[in-house]
Curated annotation (Swiss-Prot):
GO terms for molecular function: RNA binding. It holds the Pfam family Ribosomal_L7Ae. The lineage of its organism: Bacteria, Bacillati, Bacillota, Bacilli, Bacillales. It comes from Geobacillus kaustophilus (strain HTA426). HAMAP family: Ribosomal_eL8_Bact. Belongs to the eukaryotic ribosomal protein eL8 family. This is RNA-binding protein GK0100. Keywords: RNA-binding.
């Protein structure tokens, strides 16, 4: 599952703004988005990933995604860097 991918990834960026920045700079290899995030956030990140031809994986929980990133709060989006 994608939570394990995040745990095993060498370099990640956490959060919507940083994820979109990594996509625009061509640094993201994969994007993980939490399905319980606000719809406009999901759409914005997904659109940026599609534009950059980067695969998007959806997970069910912001809280679990944040935990996989070793932070104490939820994460709406995470990019695994190249």
């Amino acid at each position: 599952m994608s939570y394990e991918k995040v745990l095993q990834a060498g370099k990640i960026v956490i959060g919507t703004k940083q994820t979109i920045r990594a996509l625009k700079e061509g640094k993201a290899a994969e994007v993980i988005v939490a399905e319980d995030a606000d719809l406009p956030i999901i759409e914005k990140v997904t659109a940026a990933a599609n534009e950059a031809n980067v695969p998007v994986t959806k997970v069910d929980s912001m809280k679990k995604l944040g935990k996989a990133c070793k932070i104490q709060v939820g994460a709406a989006a995470v990019a695994i860097l190249r």
